[in-house]
């Protein structure tokens, strides 16, 4: 009986659909700001490290039905 219940629970969990395709409105632009740091070198005391800081602004807007433009 426990095996049947376990099999039903696994079948129920496996049958759930997930929507992986994002949905964006065609009339509204979406703006994202990203910031990151890239460091080079050995992380020990007394040793030099160098790095660069990155800033990025990404805008996603509707272009056509199910087509989007990334700026």
Curated annotation (Swiss-Prot):
Alphabetical list of Gene3D superfamilies matching this protein: Lipovitellin, beta-sheet shell regions, chain A
Gene Ontology molecular functions: lipid transporter activity; nutrient reservoir activity
Induction of expression: By steroids (estrogen).
Signal peptide extent: 1-15
Stretches assigned to the Vitellogenin domain: 24-71
A Pfam family reported for this protein in Swiss-Prot or TrEMBL: Vitellogenin_N
Domain of life per record: Eukaryota
Record SUPFAM superfamilies: Lipovitellin-phosvitin complex, beta-sheet shell regions
Tissue: Produced by the liver, secreted into the blood and then sequestered by receptor mediated endocytosis into growing oocytes, where it is generally cleaved, giving rise to the respective yolk components.
Swiss-Prot/TrEMBL GO biological process terms: cellular response to estrogen stimulus; response to estradiol
Keyword terms: Phosphoprotein, Signal, Storage protein
Function comment: Precursor of the major egg-yolk proteins that are sources of nutrients during early development of oviparous organisms.
Protein name from the UniProt record: Vitellogenin-B1
Organism: Xenopus laevis
